[in-house]
Amino acid sequence: MSVSAYRDDVRAGIYAPHVRELNEYVDTLRAKKPKEFVPHISPEFGGSQARLLLLTLSPGEKTRLEASGGSGLLSVENSDPAAARIAEALDHAGIDRMDCVGWNFYPWYVKGFGELEAQDRDPYLYEGVDLLIQVIARLPRLRAVFIFGKAPDLGWRLFRQSYPKTARSLKVFRHRSTGPVGYLGSVEQRMEWRRELFEEMNKAAAVIAQ
């Protein structure tokens, strides 16, 4: 979303019928912590029609409107490597954007969140559990969750303890974080991780197509 006109057009749709309920929930989260930031969910996603939830840890820098090239949106079209890798995997698997929706386990932007030590990070994960169930409750067609990274996977385990019936009803797929730290390695390593991501996303595509 490096072109501001395109960004503004997309932002104009944040209360479109398919994402209205989710983004109104985002508004309630923003009101709870007015000094902090939660990105709206991009209307490129299927919103209430989504069958696949893309679960990452927390908003990236490019979700912030004030950031250079920022969109103010949770979107796989954001101009950062983490979003680009997920977008590429979705395209490779033939998953339409309207078949999925993104969410951050801790939805507020926290600078450097991914590098926090466990004792500083885990309270955020505990808080995210009860927020995630509110999101899933707004996704009646949800079939699967794709988790990116160790920290949101830990959050999912906490979620499973609190909401076992909901967790059991969903097929779960996993991959490392697609951000710069998650893909820190040699060219050969990054290519292997990319291949693994494609394979896992293909499996997710098969499940949501059933």
Give residue ranges: language-model regions.
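Short, flexible loop segments at boundaries between secondary-structure elements
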Residues: 91, 165-204
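A polyanion-binding, active-site-adjacent surface
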Residues: 1-163, 169-176
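A charged, well-structured terminal subsegment
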Residues: 206-210
